[in-house]
Amino acid sequence: VTKQTRSLIIIPTYNEAENLEPLVTAILALDADFEILVVDDNSPDGTGEIADRLSRELPGIHVMHRPGKMGLGTAYVEGFRWAIERGYDYVFEMDCDFSHDPGYLPTFPTKITSADLVIGSRYVKGGSTPNWGILRRLISWGGNAFARLMLGLKAHDCTGGFRCYRREMLQQVPWDKIRLQGYGFQIGAVYYVERLGGKVVEFPITFEDRRVGQSKMSSRIVMEAFAYVIRMALSDKKRGDVHTLKSETT
């Protein structure tokens, strides 16, 4: 008897009261057996209360409450641990603001069967960011190019947060070494997946601007990612940059 695979979508939230219920409704409408874990950082706008109500009313909706705003990276790491403890096979990352179209979700399971990490990519052929201004495109594209160049990464969209991990890879990545608040966390995750010999597969997505609410992007998050890439590049150089951690982790 073939064991049914279990998939969990982790959605970190901070002040997403207007977006959360429409997003959950859209995901469940796919009828694809996705479960959802909302990780809420004590949102002042009542997002956590909405999440609790949804978990009572709907099957497969789980909620983790944290005491305050602790950042994207730690939300995902706590969510990953929660998922591993409960035996999920495939674990997704997804923004709550509809910049990640739920319609792409069914594509991930078709790719993850032959990969360790699948990324919905803005920077492979067919991917796009249609509503972005020049400055935002420059920062995002430049940040990706910088990370790929400095760290020798093969993935095109190293900062994108629409992802699916295979559980076995989640268990190998040293998450405690990626203590970052913003999208630098995503760069660190790709770095370790590739260094561990994992297979990364990308497919094109159209990345939309958030529908409602405030963007979480800040200059501090950009600088955090920049500093992280420099630090890891220097670390690679120091140990001879063999582009693999397998010998170190076995």
Regions found by a protein language model. Name each.
Residues 1-26:
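N-proximal low-complexity "stem/linker" segments adjacent to membrane-targeting elements
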Residues 1-7, 145, 150-153, 175-250:
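Hydrophobic helical membrane-anchoring modules
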Residues 11, 34-43, 64-65, 94:
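Short beta-strand/loop segment that forms part of the nucleotide-sugar
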Residues 18-22, 45-54:
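Acidic helix N-cap motif at the loop->helix transition within catalytic regions
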Residues 25-34:
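Short, acidic, metal-binding catalytic loop of nucleotide-sugar glycosyltransferases
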Residues 40-49, 98:
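A conserved acidic beta->alpha catalytic loop
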Residues 62-85, 90, 102-183, 210-225:
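Acceptor/aglycone-binding surface of glycosyltransferases and processive sugar-polymer synthases
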Residues 93, 119-121, 203-205:
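Short glycine/serine/threonine-enriched helix-capping/active-site loop
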